[in-house]
Amino acid sequence: MGATPRSNCRVVDKFRLPPISRFTAILLAISIGLAAIGMGGWWWLQRSSPLHFQAEQLHEPAAARFLPRNANLSFYLQLDPNQLPAYGRAVARSKQRNSAANALTQLRNGLFATAGLNYNNELSNWIGPELAIALTASSNNQIQPSWVLALSSRTANGAREFLQTFWQTRSLAGGDLSISSYRGLGLISSSNPEAPLATALINDQLVLITSSRDALEDALDSSQVDALNQSSDPQLQNWLKQNRKGVALLRSDATGISQLLGLPAKLVAEEQMQQLVGSIAVQGSELQLAAQISTGIDRNDPPLGDRANQWLQQLRHSADQINISNANSSLNSLLTVAVTKPGPLLNELQRQNQGPLLLALINSNQWLAATDVANPSPEALNQPLHLAGFDPTSINSMDVWSRLSGQTNRAGELKAILAGASASKANVRWWSNNFDELQNQLQTKGVNKKAPFIDAKSVAFSQLGPKLSRDLLGHWSFWQGLQLLAAQPLSPAVNGLEYMLEEDKTSLDLKATLHFS
């Protein structure tokens, strides 16, 4: 037999890359290394810059497990308190950077001081980017609310070392301490009747400080039952599932809204406010609040739609206040306009209007309004205004209602008292109690590119200028408290406020923006 031919076992790899030189390999390694360093450096700069606050994604707070669900007001902060002054300096105008940083420093330090804590000496070197506080109001208004404060640690031993120093300092000051165990945790409390504080350490990473030992035991009891703590609160969970961005979470019930946040009890009762959950975000020098308020009212106001934005874009004036809402809206208690003397035209316009109405307050005595072009028609106002003593006439395609005063001007002509005037332009009917203001509006060309944008689903909108915003905040007890903590007035920095409302069955969705200069 002939010899069997040997098989060719050599495999030829058609896709083998050509060999690279050592120099090329070194260059490639250096390039990859530099790219990695660059990406890491970019990430580090983004995280270390206070401006990263603007892009933060909210997440479920670890402290939620230890905050009782029956607390009337809860606030979660998810940012590094040490960076607050730097953020204020970064977004403020050049001449106001120091004052902005100082205001945030004082406000931060003042907030911790209310709990008996010195931020610079006791907290700044270890406190982490998560903290929370829950407040429970007393049935006796003369008694301060009980509270639970939760502080995260950014270092391995910072929380434990803080507690040692915290109680050592207070023990040396003459306070008697009680050390015990509760639910497997070591509890330390003070017998000082003026400051009966209590503390516990959770896994070396979370410090609980409470206004009393009872409040601490209540918090620890709640942590063992999902139905009693906020970690499993469906309203809070549903809010977080919507991928909200921000630096803070807010949760409150009706008592917290009226007694602790300081909204008028009459307003809370009229709107039947029951629960509030929301988040706070920062964008430049703006503070943005998004919230959902559960109420006991079945709401069915129609959305404003695109016409609200069209009206705002056509509006020429820089008004002290602008409101847009539907006729007979259930939200009118939230949208009052401070017209000193509304006059018969505005009163009748508001009575007869059946659709949305834009009302701009030019100053305390002058107003400008917009409605759909034929709702109501000027003719529908003739009879009631005639009964009020004002007769209709037409001047340059404008409907005017006026009456003679019986007084004469320098030329000997009788003076006229104006109730107001109206004219249409671009499918919008404009109204005003000032003839010149209406003429100026009709002569406006183009659109206002700085006009705020309203979501199409919104049922109401309000915008306040600097003065009215400061006046409104100045009468709010919660704002007054913040100014006391900051040890300086905060209102002068306020540059405006706007908010819009949407409805969903028995709840209100609120979006508000507070502008700072």
Q: Which residue stretches match the model-derived regions?
A:
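Leucine-rich, highly hydrophobic segment in Treponema pallidum outer-membrane-associated proteins
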Residues: 14-46, 54-63, 202-203, 211, ...
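N-terminal intrinsically disordered, acidic low-complexity segments at the extreme N-terminus
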Residues: 1-12
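A short acidic, often aromatic-flanked loop/helix-cap motif at beta-alpha or helix-coil junctions
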Residues: 83-84, 257-258, 408-412, 467-470
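Structural boundary/hinge residues at secondary-structure and domain interfaces
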Residues: 18-25, 35-174, 184, 262-267, ...
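Single conserved position on a long alpha-helix in the C-terminal lobe of the eukaryotic protein kinase
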Residues: 75, 121-236, 352-456
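Surface-exposed polar/charged interaction patches
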Residues: 93-97, 110-117, 129, 169, ...
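Aromatic/basic-lined ligand-recognition segments
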Residues: 273-277, 347, 409-417
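Alpha-helix boundary/N-cap detector
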Residues: 99-102, 114, 231, 340, ...
